[in-house]
Amino acid sequence: MPSKFSCRKLRETGQRFESFLAERGLDLETDRERLRTIYNHDFKPSYGTPAPGFSSMLYGMKIANLAFVTKTRVRFFKLDRWADVQLPEKRRIKPGSNISKQHRSLLARIFHDRAEYLHGKHGVDVEVQGPHEARDGQLLIHLDLNRKEVLTLRLRNGGSKPVTLTHLFPLCWTPQFVFYHGEQDLPCPLGPGESYELHIYCKTSIVGYFPATVLWELLGPGESGAEGAETFYIARFLAAVAHSPLAAQLKPTTPFKRPPRLTRNSVLTNRIEEGERPDRAKGYELELSLALGTYYPPILLRQLLPTLLQGPSIFTAPKEVAEIKAQLETTLKSRNYEVKLRLLLHLEELQMEHDIRHYDLDSVPMTWDPVDQNPRLLTLEVPGVAESRPSVLRGDHLFALLSSETQQDDPVTYKGFVHKVELDRVKLSFSTSLLSRFVDGLTFKVNFTFNRQPLRVQHRALELTGRWVLWPMLFPVASRGVSLLPSDVKFKLYDRSLESNPEQLQAMKHIVRGTTRPAPYIIFGPPGTGKTVTLVEAIKQVVKHLPKAHILACAPSNSGADLLCQRLRVHLPSSIYRLLAPSRDIRMVPEDIKTCCNWDAKKGEYVYPAKKHLQQYRVLITTLITASRLVSAQFPIDHFTHIFIDEAGHCMEPESLVAIAGLMDVKETGNPGGQLVLAGDPRQLGPVLRSPLALKHGLGYSLLERLLAYNSLYKKGPNGYDPQFITKLLRNYRSHPTILDIPNQLYYDGELQACADVVDRERFCRWEGLPQQGFPIIFHGVMGKDEREGNSPSFFNPEEAATVTSYLKQLLAPSSKKGKARLSPRNVGVISPYRKQVEKIRYCITKLDRELRGLDDIKDLKVGSVEEFQGQERSVILISTVRSSQSFVQLDLDFNLGFLKNPKRFNVAVTRAKALLIVVGNPLLLGHDPDWKTFLEFCKENGGYTGCPFPAKLDLQQGQDLLQGLSKLSPSTSGPRRHQNLPQEREGEGGLPLQVEPEWRNEL
């Protein structure tokens, strides 16, 4: 019958019995039956409250590692005495106090190759006494808040020869651990059977995961004088853990297992049967005059890619590899423009081919379409498709192989075309031969593909760039000084707010006059400065003052293009036309632009008017990729006099070219041709790439960022930027001055001015949840733990998720607090760089927490990645940084993950907030990054820091030493050296690293 007493109660009773024995001089008694008699007849009557039985008490002590128990003997470890004894201060060890740079590098290697240092050597090993749980090579000490636990690590020489303990290194930067060494001084000889004790006090007043490492350095057996003796190391990894109730519910559901090695195109066979493609819109009248090539990556590049990633090999051709590397490393110029950018696009596609395999499905059932009851369509559930992981759009295809035929010599592969996407389900058309034999529940092995259309139109744009000689626009050297308007023209503004903003007004006037041509005009718009407002006003003024002008207005995303349309239709309702791709879900299109886009509500489908009809509109609005349809229709090269690209810093340079090459001409002399306008911020996130090789060699640069970084026309001089070519907007209309302070200093030369509405920006300055009234930033320090589960490589941190949830309850709970404004969930955003943390936080607020899940509009609270919040703002932003472990930091740095060493991601995250910014993270780890270090110290100095104790000194150099050690592993201690840019656990087929699930493109 199970005991009615908890393990904690059993342990506490046993420790009190141990003290009872010591007080009576019976602490040396080990006879089990005599101890039972003392317990039942002497101890229990004096206990005062019901006590467990003797055997139950022993069980509790045994599982807590506080007693050694046999059928006849009991030996208590007597550790609890340490909890009440103050050891001499001279025996206390200050963690890290005597660690040299050499030893820091050694510790970094030990973090990486833990198993090697957990085993004893030469008969020397470590005995552990005290309450702990051994898990994955780590000693976990579970703590109740404000209750002390004591652990003893006894280094014992169980060998036959003497050894010498030369150094003892406890490594811990948190106050939850206190270390006391034994009586002996170091170096300390240990003969056979001798031991050296380390006593560890553990106590915490806050929840969290507090790691520590203990390293013993020893001199092995050798001749006298020890000249030939071997130095060896033994380590133990500790962690004190105190969970909040919510965090305990977020622990990994299944142990993390690395995904199996991926097999490329595993379902493709010699026999492929196709289904029916979705019907082309009956109203598709737009010409297709210019062919679009396939532009597949060259076979040789596929073969050489592993060598490019991993280094030379005897099985590769050095000459070809050297040629490719030379192309990659050469500075981008007009003479190598097409060759280099085409190569980078191929590298990106090869990475995409590899990454898409991550979503392949095995033994998944399909069913007949249950909703439309369409006998031609089958339904497949695809987890993650609603979040574009993977992206599946109407018109895309996938490959399926019957599970029952996978072992056949020549099975049939079925190519299914996507007709409809509904949340996590797709409806597919397959060949009639499959449909004729199909029954509900038939299972398949499925390979996903990605849409190559965006890549193909970028390759074509590179071809057209050279054909139309656009170098004066892409590598500008001067303006030709030709104005489109008289110098004395007066502007009547549509948006009167520009009257009080000289920078916006200046940019608009230069754009309309066109004096920058053939060079592009750049609107450099830091967060919240109104770059889209400026761009929209410029478009309206061009339409007004230049009657013959025709404008193409683009953005990389549908949301960006929709916003342009919404802003323009206010004053130009009959002059604009929004051209949408057929894959766009009409339910996602804002209602107010449906009347001026290519959706035919009567037919229930998209229409594509002929070129002649589209040319009648003064302004066409598309995404960059959809602009390729105008190129295919061969619009006259001089039709568009102006091309505007919003969010221009967020797209690859070849993507910008899709809307330029073939649609705009640059005259060799005289009239400089059309005006290109780029609006964006090079200090915020650039394009999302998958290939680290393409990223390293420049594909991550947008056209806007390249011009600002390398072209002299756009360089900042002693008097600022040249307003003829570029305007930097300076007035921030979004954030409280305190929130703006650090990013302003770090990225914008301190020039930004806080101009947000005072009432809006100060609505949380008196909130009682602030550590410091009037300072609307909170950094809540949490010593959490990085976790992973299942086969997902993405990280999550339960304690941070619980802390974020706690703040959300304070902000959104119906019972208002003093100083807190009424807040709707739609005005709150939660940002985390890891997909799994996003999922866990959503789970907390929609399932686990009773108060939050009960709110009617809780689904309006957006939880997403930094990329998903670019261009957006919320009254309140909460950020969960997730990372707490040194062990994986180098992985983040190598693959541009997380926040560390990623100033653009940091900048975007902290500048989304209007009135309140709450950051939850590990200050010890974030302090290794200079930008985060600046932010942390800013919060501390102004009273905005709370949570775990703030580190006395954020030692940036020490952190960098440890990180350096991780990336320079010694072959002598860690086995064969691995390629530095490819951590072993991330490698996939051909050495290609498996990225942590960035969202796939779903904008066409």
From Swiss-Prot:
Binding positions (ATP): G525, P526, P527, G528, T529, G530, K531, T532
One of the Pfam families matching this protein, by short name: Mov-10_helical
Enzyme class: hydrolase
Sites bearing N6-acetyllysine, chain numbering: K148
Listed GO CC annotations: cytoplasmic ribonucleoprotein granule; cytoplasmic stress granule; cytosol; nucleus; P-body
Protein name: Putative helicase MOV-10
Catalytic activity: ATP + H2O = ADP + phosphate + H(+)
Family to which this protein belongs: Belongs to the DNA2/NAM7 helicase family. SDE3 subfamily.
Catalytic activity, EC: 3.6.4.13
An annotated Gene Ontology molecular function: RNA binding
Protein origin, superkingdom: Eukaryota
PTM annotation: Ubiquitinated by the DCX(DCAF12) complex that specifically recognizes the glutamate-leucine (Glu-Leu) degron at the C-terminus, leading to its degradation.
Record text on subunit structure and interactions: Interacts with DICER1, AGO2, TARBP2, EIF6 and RPL7A (60S ribosome subunit); they form a large RNA-induced silencing complex (RISC). Interacts with APOBEC3G in an RNA-dependent manner. Interacts with TRIM71 (via NHL repeats) in an RNA-dependent manner. Interacts with both protein products of LIRE1, ORF1p and ORF2p. Interacts with TUT4 and, to a lesser extent, TUT7; the interactions are RNA-dependent. Interacts with AGO2, TNRC6B and UPF1; the interactions are direct and RNA-dependent.
Positions carrying Phosphoserine: S433, S970
Function: 5' to 3' RNA helicase that is involved in a number of cellular roles ranging from mRNA metabolism and translation, modulation of viral infectivity, inhibition of retrotransposition, or regulation of synaptic transmission. Plays an important role in innate antiviral immunity by promoting type I interferon production. Mechanistically, specifically uses IKKepsilon/IKBKE as the mediator kinase for IRF3 activation. Contributes to UPF1 mRNA target degradation by translocation along 3' UTRs. Required for microRNA (miRNA)-mediated gene silencing by the RNA-induced silencing complex (RISC).
Record annotation: effect of changing K531A: Abolishes inhibition of retrotransposition
InterPro entries: DNA2/NAM7-like_C, DNA2/NAM7_AAA_11, MOV-10-like_beta-barrel, MOV-10/SDE3_DEXXQ/H-box, Mov-10_helical, MOV-10_Ig-like, MOV-10_N, P-loop_NTPase
